[in-house]
Amino acid sequence: MSLKVQNPNNVRVYTVSGEGVTQRLPNWISKRKLKKDYALSHRIELLQDFEYPEASNRIKCTRDGKYAMATGVYKPHIKVFDFAEMSLKFERHTDAENVQFEILSDDWTKSVHLQTDRTVDFHSQGGIHYSTRIPKYGRDLKYHYPNCDLYLAAAGDEVYRLNLEQGRFLNPLKIESAQIDSPTGGVNVIDINPMHQLLAFGTDAGSVEFWDPRDRSRVGILEIPSTVPSTPYSDNSRSVTALKYRNDGLNVAIGLSDGATLLYDLRSSSPYMSKDQGYSMPIKSLHWMDSALDGTARVLSADSKIIKIWEKDTGKPFSSIEPTVELNDVCPIEGTGLILTANEGSPMHAFYIPSLNPAPRWCSFLDNITEEMEENPAPTIYDDYKFVTKKELLNLGLDHLVGTGVIRAYMHGFFIDNNLYEKARLIANPFSYEEHRQKIVKERLEKQRASKIRSQNRPKVNAGLASRLSYQENKLRKKTGVTDGPSILEDERFKNVFTDKEFEVDEDTLEYKQLHPSRSEARGLTAAEESEEEKEHTKGIKFSSDEESLSDMEEENETFDALVDRRKTEQQVSNEKTPQETIRSTPSGMEMTFKVEKKKKSKPVNRDEDSTSGKKKQVTQGRRSASKNVFRNM
């Protein structure tokens, strides 16, 4: 499955429907055969039956954005497409070919059609509601919603008014600038400003008249200035063939018969931008496009050969679409990147530009499948041949083959088969294989070197700070999803922090360790903390000097015999028992060592058999026997 893609100005334009994408299938073909056909089973069909037997004339979308209405031949009929179902809703045949139509309701149920036989057909949900005729052949029509007037432009200097509320024709508007002496003179196009309802009529004489619908009077007339350059292939008469107001109420685009597009501000009589299509063909369609991706205001201008999209303020080209058939009408779906066209040829076309706007909601899958379905360039016949000049052919020693079927002359050289070229090159230059081998080895070595992990150039000053900042940046980028962006290490404002020694951070200072305790080492005790620790360790412990003073006081009150007995007892205890603990003073504080005394396990105390704590054997005396055999225990 593949899509045709164009890449003008590095902007991808996908053809999602039309010539080469949607294939017409005969009615008699079997569905079983379709399953075996890879191309047909993997084709894309954005809208079912999006085609006409011969050609399509006009196409428009409804205001609710759910339907599209198109007219075409042959036989003349109307088609309505349902976007939600992506298929044809219905088709309705008419008596004459359509010139222009207008959708009156928000959906497709009410519409008015101007036909080539001067008839005006009103269509409702059930069919043709009413049909009437105008005196001259019509060229365009517009519906004015506030007063229910239908304006019909035709040949001559009159614009007919048909009031749909009263159901009758009103006095027509007299357009003085229209050329009534010319057989083709008249009013070509009509447009109504969506903001203040100002009427604009483009004439065949190359002028635009502005009318106020409230009092039906002309406000002003705009003549095409002579300073606007014309193409050398255009005639002297330049007529207005397209008109389009912008939604802001101030800007209007005017398309001329020689392929020029002029942008005007209603407050000025001179254009602030002009653009030429380049084909000297009349402009058939103009549209204002606002991009939701970059917010740029653009203009779409189309003639029968090409569709151009360019910026409103600068005229810079954005993209262009050049279909294989002639265009009749263009309908971009508002707020999206999808463009529908009515054209000569059976299939109507649909183009999708992802960089302009996203896909419509009813075909949002286009955003995902366009790149996957993009067609791969097919190899051409020249891929198997090598182009060489006559001098290169002499160096290879193949000049004697000129004129044979092996070498084919082309422009200033020759086409030669690739295999023959390689063999001749090896014979003419035996060392070419060794050069080729060295080249391959060099490329592989460079590829391996590129794949190795290279050490990053760490700054000489504050290397630790730089590594921590880069780690935090990478962590933040993974969290936010932003892969590219300016790094703080490359910021000119903080450049001196990583290059100048004056900004170096000393991580060994006490202040830095207090601010970063997780990276600082364990510090020593202060003098106050050491004194408090000594008090805690020495609390409750009697030193040898205290014991001696107490013993001296006791010795004064004891008799000699009692003192001798007590000394003997202390000596025996000191000989039998080693000291349990030793306390000594060190520069870092008090230190105490002790030994845990091992105690012998005490033997269990023998208990009397009659005690209630336990019995060695069961006592059966005085108890009732469970068996009737009284001699069992005898």
Swiss-Prot record:
<dbReference type="Pfam" id="PF23097">
    <property type="entry name" value="NOL10_2nd"/>
</dbReference>
<feature type="region of interest" description="Disordered">
    <location>
        <begin position="513"/>
        <end position="634"/>
    </location>
</feature>
<keyword id="KW-0597">Phosphoprotein</keyword>
<dbReference type="GO" id="GO:0005829">
    <property type="term" value="C:cytosol"/>
</dbReference>
<keyword id="KW-0853">WD repeat</keyword>
<feature type="repeat" description="WD 4">
    <location>
        <begin position="278"/>
        <end position="320"/>
    </location>
</feature>
<feature type="compositionally biased region" description="Acidic residues">
    <location>
        <begin position="546"/>
        <end position="559"/>
    </location>
</feature>
<dbReference type="GO" id="GO:0032040">
    <property type="term" value="C:small-subunit processome"/>
</dbReference>
<feature type="repeat" description="WD 1">
    <location>
        <begin position="51"/>
        <end position="91"/>
    </location>
</feature>
<dbReference type="InterPro" id="IPR056551">
    <property type="entry name" value="Beta-prop_NOL10_N"/>
</dbReference>
<dbReference type="GO" id="GO:0000462">
    <property type="term" value="P:maturation of SSU-rRNA from tricistronic rRNA transcript (SSU-rRNA, 5.8S rRNA, LSU-rRNA)"/>
</dbReference>
<comment type="subunit">
    <text>Component of the 90S pre-ribosomes.</text>
</comment>
<feature type="repeat" description="WD 3">
    <location>
        <begin position="235"/>
        <end position="274"/>
    </location>
</feature>
<dbReference type="InterPro" id="IPR001680">
    <property type="entry name" value="WD40_rpt"/>
</dbReference>
<feature type="modified residue" description="Phosphoserine">
    <location>
        <position position="531"/>
    </location>
</feature>
<feature type="compositionally biased region" description="Basic and acidic residues">
    <location>
        <begin position="513"/>
        <end position="522"/>
    </location>
</feature>
<keyword id="KW-0677">Repeat</keyword>
<dbReference type="GO" id="GO:0030686">
    <property type="term" value="C:90S preribosome"/>
</dbReference>
<protein>
    <recommendedName>
        <fullName>Ribosome biogenesis protein enp2 homolog</fullName>
    </recommendedName>
</protein>
<dbReference type="GO" id="GO:0005634">
    <property type="term" value="C:nucleus"/>
</dbReference>
<keyword id="KW-0690">Ribosome biogenesis</keyword>
<feature type="compositionally biased region" description="Polar residues">
    <location>
        <begin position="619"/>
        <end position="634"/>
    </location>
</feature>
<dbReference type="InterPro" id="IPR012580">
    <property type="entry name" value="NUC153"/>
</dbReference>
<dbReference type="InterPro" id="IPR036322">
    <property type="entry name" value="WD40_repeat_dom_sf"/>
</dbReference>
<comment type="function">
    <text>May be involved in rRNA-processing and ribosome biosynthesis.</text>
</comment>
<keyword id="KW-0539">Nucleus</keyword>
<dbReference type="Pfam" id="PF08159">
    <property type="entry name" value="NUC153"/>
</dbReference>
<dbReference type="InterPro" id="IPR015943">
    <property type="entry name" value="WD40/YVTN_repeat-like_dom_sf"/>
</dbReference>
<dbReference type="Pfam" id="PF23098">
    <property type="entry name" value="Beta-prop_NOL10_N"/>
</dbReference>
<feature type="compositionally biased region" description="Polar residues">
    <location>
        <begin position="571"/>
        <end position="588"/>
    </location>
</feature>
<dbReference type="InterPro" id="IPR056550">
    <property type="entry name" value="NOL10_2nd"/>
</dbReference>
<keyword id="KW-0698">rRNA processing</keyword>
<feature type="repeat" description="WD 2">
    <location>
        <begin position="182"/>
        <end position="221"/>
    </location>
</feature>
<comment type="similarity">
    <text>Belongs to the WD repeat NOL10/ENP2 family.</text>
</comment>
<dbReference type="InterPro" id="IPR040382">
    <property type="entry name" value="NOL10/Enp2"/>
</dbReference>
<dbReference type="GO" id="GO:0005730">
    <property type="term" value="C:nucleolus"/>
</dbReference>
